[in-house]
Amino acid sequence: CEKLLAEQFNLPTFTVLLEGALEKGKDATAGGAKVNVGPTMNMCGFGTMVDSVAAIKKVVFEDRAATLEEVCAACMQNFVGYEDLRTKLQAAPKYGNDDDFADAIAADLWKWFSTCTMRLKMYRGHYCDAAVQMVQSNVGYGAMTGATPNGRLAGMPLSDTMSATQQADTHGPTAAARAWAKAKASRISDLAVPRATIRWDKLIISYGTSRLGVE
């Protein structure tokens, strides 16, 4: 992948803006940057995965309200005939609410994914970086993904980036931010805030540090 990228998909305009690239005589795709990282191994649907594992742990292993086989069968049938089980799975703790039950699972899963990814040696000698797919990828991948143990129906979008599952973060932005911090995901999450909750006359935007805040 890296070799083909350097040979066939050069980025000359981008390269001339990089410090040290012209001196090296290398395109950005061929290691011309002062600091070279990547490529990345991208994950999609982190929140969906966390909530699914949390639901299985809670419903199957702690409450013993269903077997793992029953959960698998429910997902295979898109929860048709398993509506009561789906309700139980949906009631399990959700990532993004400062809930230690779900957030501990999130931290473990991200550590596992990033550790496994960084073991991969890449073409230019760097390790592979763990990353997440950004906006819109979750919709396309969700359309191709069957039902999941968190109660999500087949074909519905997966969760976006490393943020919580859509409408699952019900305790506000502070709780969501605390969950990201526990998962070490604060720099690669996004957050939707209702317009009615923002004091626009007090809004502070800092583009340089990618921060948005309120006085």
Task: Give residue spans per PLM region.
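Acidic, glycine-enriched catalytic cores built around paired aspartates
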Residues: 1-215
